[in-house]
């Protein structure tokens, strides 16, 4: 294999640039040419492809977002769209593709694999919801962004003796909520993977207030429901002054943490190794700090699960 491509797809995550950098530099180290595909699968269809050199990825390891840009691409879900994408890959002489993104991006890589084009997926999403890896690129940075926000919210919550509901990202996965809630000392954590008892949450807030607690923090993953609605109900049933903070897209931005930069560098380089070994249709990950790879079809068939021991601990510590 003498020429490979790389693209970023779906929602951006901090560390994607570090992964792109690793792909480019690792490939060039092995005398393999690298082509960047801009705007994800949309750029693949539209032919927005250009050769990348070492200088192309200079000064990006510390930058959030993605140099290659990203976009949703409904057209790629069609057979015609995918065939057009492969046609463009062949036009540039590209023999393998590294896809950096989440489960939707992996689905695109799966479709290309089924058409006979070798792809390797690199998990890049702040949600940490890709099976087969302990961590995804961007999760640690997003987690630290949320923790920083919680710490600041706690300051004002204490000053005004208020209860705060903090809504974080996670439509189907509660890792951001769970990890940030545990690290931030939240009184309650609501995640999509676990049932919750609103009456118990209310009772817990009342108990805290009765023993002189000056503030409370409730973390809600967006997939559970609206933080605003939770805030209204809490205030109505407890008479505690309650405010809601929806963190939104700030969780996706910012300079990647050291952990995410190292993770992205390791996974990006490993993806290139697999392609050069002729192993397409794979996705890479890290488990117990060891690099691993899986059949991308198997990963897409699995469902993300939350760490039940960690969730249980969060419940035990929020008495």
UniProtKB/Swiss-Prot annotation:
Catalysed reaction, written as an equation: beta-D-fructose 6-phosphate + ATP = beta-D-fructose 1,6-bisphosphate + ADP + H(+)
Binding site for ADP: 21-25, 154, 185-187, 211, 213-215
Binding site for ATP: 11, 72-73, 102-105
Keywords: Allosteric enzyme, ATP-binding, Cytoplasm, Glycolysis, Kinase, Magnesium, Metal-binding, Nucleotide-binding, Transferase
Major enzyme class: transferase
Cell compartment(s), UniProt: Cytoplasm
Molecular functions (GO terms): 6-phosphofructokinase activity; AMP binding; ATP binding; fructose-6-phosphate binding; identical protein binding; metal ion binding; monosaccharide binding
Family: Belongs to the phosphofructokinase type A (PFKA) family. ATP-dependent PFK group I subfamily. Prokaryotic clade 'B1' sub-subfamily.
Name this protein carries in UniProt: ATP-dependent 6-phosphofructokinase
Organism: Bacillus pumilus (strain SAFR-032)
Phylogenetic classification of the source organism: Bacteria, Bacillati, Bacillota, Bacilli, Bacillales
Gene assigned in the entry: pfkA
